[in-house]
């Protein structure tokens, strides 16, 4: 299983309002005709079991919701789980890493709008993390586009 890292997003990450700290962080998964993640460190097609590192989640962010828009579906039978891992690779006793914090075994092979399906209580990240999509079911062998929005409050480091 490979870990494929998406290059840093060139989109600006704003969202704070004068009366609160609500933020929406955006990430995009776009693949070419052979199924490889564009703008990443790999030219190989995304295989079942690959971890896609979509980008940073800041320390002190409350993870409240995720909205995933599958506008151009992946190959039939491709599924995914969406969660997070800490940048330093070391788990936290307070908030353990969770590879399916937002959802698990959800189809990415059909156009849809997906929401957080895990009923776990919102958590505040005690240290910097990475948003991770882990694929399953089948390899992707086609062009696709999936846009991910993580919604939460930037409450600050503890």
Set out the residue ranges of the language-model regions.
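Surface-exposed, low-hydrophobicity beta-strand/loop segments enriched in small/polar/acidic residues
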Residues: 2-158
